[in-house]
Structure formats: C-alpha cells, structure tokens
C-alpha cells in the first residue's frame, strides 16, 4: 500500500511540474502577440529573472523524477515525452502551435495522452503488476481524443484573439474542417475508447456514475438553458463529459478499487479531502437530477386534446 501512496504522490507532483512549465513557456512565447491583441498574459510585467528561475526550477525538479524512473523505460519515455510535447508546441523554431494539425496533436499529447500513460505505468509499477496492452491502448486513444477535442474547442473559442495576435492555429487555418473533425471523428473515437475502458474495468460503478452524469446534463440543459457542446463554442454551454471525467470518473474508479481492496478506501478518503468542493457540488447536482427524474416518472400523465 505504501508503494501506491508513493506512486500517487509522485504522479501528482511530476505532472504539476510539467503543467507549470507548459504554462510559463506558452505565456513567454505568446507575450508579444497577447499584448498586441489586448489579451491577458501570465508573465506580463514579471521580471525575466523570475520567469527564468521558475522555468529552471520546474525543469530541474522534473529531471529529478526522470532520474528516479530511469529503470522503467516506458514510464520514463512517456514522462519525458510530456515535456517534449509542451516544448515543441510553444518554443521556436518548432512552435507547433502555429503549424495546424501538428499543434493540436502536440497539445493533446502533452496535456492528456502522455500524462495518462504516465499514470497507467506508475500505477502498475506501484502495484507491481504487469501492464495490459489492451488497457494501455484504450487509455491512449481515449486520452488523445479527449485532448484533441479540448484543444480544438479552445482554439475555436480563442479564434478572434488568435487572429488579432497573428497566431495561425489549426482552427484559424481550417475554420470549417475543425468543428467537423472534432465532432464526427474525434468524439466517436473518444466514446469508443471510453466504452472499451469501462468494459475492461468490469464494474457497475463507472457506468452508474456515467448514467447519473447524463441525467444531470439533461436536467442542466433544460433548467438553466445551457447548451451541450462537443467542440463548437456556444453561449451558456457546458462541455460534454468534462465534469464526468474531472469529478465523477475518479471517484467511481476509486470506489471500484475499494470494493476489491478495502485498503484503497484510504486513497478514496484522501481524494475527497483534496478535492472536496468538486465532489460535493457534483453529488448535490446529481442528487437533485435523480430526485427530479423520480418525481417526473411518478407523476401521472394527463393526456388530452386541445
């Protein structure tokens, strides 16, 4: 159990470091364009020394994790690939951010694909279990597809600012194709991979939470007049499945693991303590959704003409 705790903490710290690095270098390389477009930038007004120190500290700490994992080729490769993807996306002369499809692939790989694979390999390492090829493939397709959907949505949302700043992103280069690819190619791949993951998990908990999320999404759309969005931004919207992935799926997985090994209850408790607000809000919304569904189902239907 202690090795799983170490793995979980290592994953959290290692990915946070990479995320900080990605955010800083993206702001640094976008600074001139953001100022021209009147867009907020995180490093605007900061001293160059402070920014350079932050980058150096995150890179140094990241290499420490790489050294600790040097004996695990798959884990090390995926972790280093996370940093490489972020670097290729933002830094010249590569700057894949402005190279169309290469940019969205790079961002999705750095934000979702490689961190998800790091989590898989690290969990197997901590549990001292063999890695399942089918599980790795399912997680990889799901994470990459979700990452692609996220970056396409972001670029479509930010297209006016990118135009003002002169950034030629995938959404700017292909304004008609981007929504269609995200909706009719990427999203079905994401759903198929998610279904494969749920089948391999072999527990009723994640599908049950998914059904509850669907009830909430339908009720939310009706009650608050919000629009479900796959990739195309709309006024008063919510991104389909985002809250399930961020709030409910982790809890469902931990409950599943707790049923199989009661020691995991400690990890579940730690998760609830670390992210209480998200979990509480999700539970309240789901409870309200299911209650409303039950009430509607129990009410008699008054038919008639007129």
Across the structure, where does each feature detected by a protein language model lie?
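Membrane-embedded alpha-helical segments that form the functional core of polytopic membrane enzymes
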Residues: 1-25, 73-87, 129-153
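Multi-pass membrane catalytic core of lipid/isoprenoid biosynthesis enzymes
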Residues: 13, 31-80, 167-209
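Acidic (Asp/Glu-rich) catalytic motifs at the cytosolic membrane interface
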Residues: 14-42, 146-171
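Alpha-helical transmembrane segments and their membrane-interface exit regions
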Residues: 16-18, 81-91, 142-148, 211-223, ...
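C-terminal ends of transmembrane helices
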Residues: 27-28, 32, 85-100, 151, ...
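Intramembrane alpha-helical segments
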Residues: 44-128
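Core segments of transmembrane alpha-helices
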Residues: 54-62, 107-120, 180-194, 242-252
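Extended hydrophobic alpha-helices typical of membrane-associated regions
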Residues: 105, 206-306
């Amino acid at each position: 159990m202690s090795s799983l705790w170490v793995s979980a903490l290592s994953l959290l710290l290692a990915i946070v470091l990479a995320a900080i690095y990605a955010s800083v270098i993206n702001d640094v390389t976008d600074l001139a364009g953001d100022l021209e477009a009147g867009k907020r930038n995180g490093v605007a007004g900061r001293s160059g020394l402070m920014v350079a120190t932050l980058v150096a500290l995150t890179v140094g700490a990241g290499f420490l994790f790489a050294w600790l994992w040097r004996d695990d080729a798959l884990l090390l490769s995926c972790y280093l690939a996370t940093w490489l993807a972020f670097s290729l996306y933002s830094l010249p002369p590569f700057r894949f951010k402005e190279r169309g499809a290469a940019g969205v692939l790079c961002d999705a790989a750095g934000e979702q694909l490689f961190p998800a694979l790091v989590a898989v390999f690290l969990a197997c390492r901590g549990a001292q279990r063999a890695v399942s090829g089918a599980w790795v493939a399912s997680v990889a397709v799901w994470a990459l597809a979700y990452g692609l959907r996220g970056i396409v949505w972001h670029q479509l949302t930010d297209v006016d600012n990118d135009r003002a700043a002169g950034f030629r992103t995938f959404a700017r280069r292909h304004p008609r194709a981007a929504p269609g690819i995200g909706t009719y190619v990427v999203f079905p791949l994401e759903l198929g991979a998610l279904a494969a993951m749920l089948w391999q998990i072999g527990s009723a908990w994640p599908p049950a939470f998914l059904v509850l999320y669907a009830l909430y999404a339908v009720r939310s759309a009706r009650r608050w007049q919000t629009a479900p969005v796959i990739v195309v931004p709309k006024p008063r919207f919510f991104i389909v499945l985002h809250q399930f992935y961020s709030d409910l799926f982790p809890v469902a997985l931990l409950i599943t693991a707790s049923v199989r090994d009661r020691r995991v209850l400690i990890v579940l408790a730690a998760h609830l303590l670390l992210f209480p607000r998200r979990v509480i809000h999700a539970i309240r919304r789901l409870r309200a959704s299911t209650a409303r569904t039950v009430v509607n189902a129990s009410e008699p239907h008054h038919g008639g003409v007129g």
